[in-house]
């Protein structure tokens, strides 16, 4: 079985821009991870109408954007449902400036929270750990980089924040997200 690989940030960005969609790769991935972590079905295409409504006034996407969006969705499902938990955020690479990466992280986190809302997350029925993780993400979404401060120190802090975002997301997904049911778990009579 081949491993599903996340498309590169620039590939996703190009496909979205070329399709005339006003959504960044970070926003798209954040939305998808939020919806999946909030309990969206993994077995059908219910994510597409939600994405169309949120990003394109309900209009479908061109085929090239759908292809890339589907690849991002499939890779995200694979990451979030794997035995070894690993989630790579689709944000600008380390080659980009710290400002661009911080903006990408902010977009990602804001859209993750929106993705939870799209699947109608009910906070009153969640654990304290989930509420704390969500509160941390809401705080992180408001963070910014101060150009006057030590950029090397901020770079180190940024990496710690990215790791904390991953932990918060995995905490939320562990409580609310669906898991893929494999054939091995089915009973044969």
UniProtKB/Swiss-Prot annotation:
GO terms for cellular component: cytosol. Transmembrane segments: none annotated. SUPFAM superfamilies: YgfB-like. It comes from the Bacteria. InterPro entries: YgfB-like, YgfB-like_sf. Disulfide bonds: none annotated. Belongs to the UPF0149 family. HAMAP family: UPF0149. This is UPF0149 protein VFMJ11_2207.
């Amino acid at each position: 079985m081949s491993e599903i690989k996340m498309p590169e940030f620039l590939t996703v960005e190009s496909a979205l821009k070329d399709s005339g969609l006003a959504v960044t790769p970070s926003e798209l991935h954040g939305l998808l991870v939020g919806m999946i972590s909030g309990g969206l079905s993994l077995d059908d295409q219910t994510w597409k109408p939600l994405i169309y409504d949120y990003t394109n006034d309900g209009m479908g996407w061109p085929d090239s954007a759908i292809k890339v969006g589907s690849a991002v969705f499939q890779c995200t499902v694979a990451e979030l449902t794997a035995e070894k938990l690993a989630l790579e955020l689709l944000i600008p690479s380390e080659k980009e400036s710290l400002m661009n990466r911080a903006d990408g992280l902010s977009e990602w986190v804001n859209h993750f929270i929106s993705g939870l809302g799209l699947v109608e997350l009910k906070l009153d029925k969640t654990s304290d750990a989930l509420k704390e993780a969500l509160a941390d993400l809401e705080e992180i979404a408001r963070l910014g980089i101060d150009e006057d401060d030590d950029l090397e120190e901020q770079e180190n802090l940024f990496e710690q924040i990215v790791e904390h975002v991953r932990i918060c997301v995995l905490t939320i997904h562990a409580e609310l997200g669906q898991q893929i049911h494999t054939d091995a778990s089915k009973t044969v009579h």
